[in-house]
Each structure stands twice: as structure tokens, then as C-alpha cells.
Amino acid sequence: MLENKCRGMSEAKLRSSQMIKKNFLIKFSLIFSIFLIDQISKYYIISIFKFENDLIYLTSFLNFQLIWNEGIAFGLLSFNNEFFYNLITLVIFFVIIILLFLIKKEDQHSYFYSMIVGGALGNFVDRIRHSSVPDFIDFHISNFHWFVFNIADIFVSLGVVCLIIAEIFFNKNKSNEKI
């Protein structure tokens, strides 16, 4: 009887361990896929543009335009100052490290963190390689143009939006427990 109980516990631990490994593989694949898609898209855009600010008209609301961004997502915090550039790069590095630790948790948020890390790694590599990040997606409605952005920015933003939605709609009980 005791032997069967011990065997059942070890089988449960084995299944749990296999599930953790499977989830880690999924999260790593998500990060790597986002990073790879981002880097390939940037490589392609850089290769077809001869000059910065050249335009490729795709539709009535979408263009490709190469912009070199020294700030963070959507051109925010672009100071043209080496100190701030280095500070932002250092902060991004530490945010990626923190998110990698959060990804190890086995909860729904870890997949959203994986999306953020995939995008952040793509932009971080560009900051190191090019000293700026190539942005190229120019979404606009008539003459109103949104910030020019890239694939990495999309996944960072999507991950953050998913985290916010999860907190607002799916973690109501946790917020009530803290009160």
C-alpha cells in the first residue's frame, strides 16, 4: 500500500517536471520566434532602403519608412545624449533580466512576459549592434501618423496590454485579498 502511494507521488512529480519542461520550451520558443521574426524583418527593411526616411507606400493607411530610433518604444525618450542612451540601454538590460526570472513562474503571466522579452531582446540587440533601433512600420489615418515602430515594439506592447487585461479582468480576487 505504502509502495503504491510512493509510486503515485513520484509519478505525479515526474508529470509535473515534464509539464514544467514543456512550458519552458514553449516560452523559450515564443521568445526566440519573436526575436527571429523581428531581426529578419529589420534586416530586410535595412537592405531595401537606401536612405533614411525613404517611403514605401503599401496601403492608404500603412507605409514602410526607415527611422533610426535612439530612444525606447515608439521613439519615446530620444534625447540625443550619450549618457541617457547608455542609461536607457542599462535599464532595458535589467528589465530583461527581471522578466526572465518572472518567466520561470508557472502562471498565465509568464507567457506575456515572454512576448515582452522577445521584443525587448530584439531591440536590445539592435541598440548594441547599431547604437539605435530601426523602426519602419508607419501606420496612419489620412495625415495623422502614429509613431513609426517595429515588430519588437508590437510584441512588447501586446505583452503589456495582455498583462493589464489579465490583471483587470482575471485577478479580481487577488486584489480583494490585499484590502
Region spans (language model):
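Alpha-helical transmembrane bundles and membrane-interface segments of multipass inner-membrane proteins
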Residues: 2-179
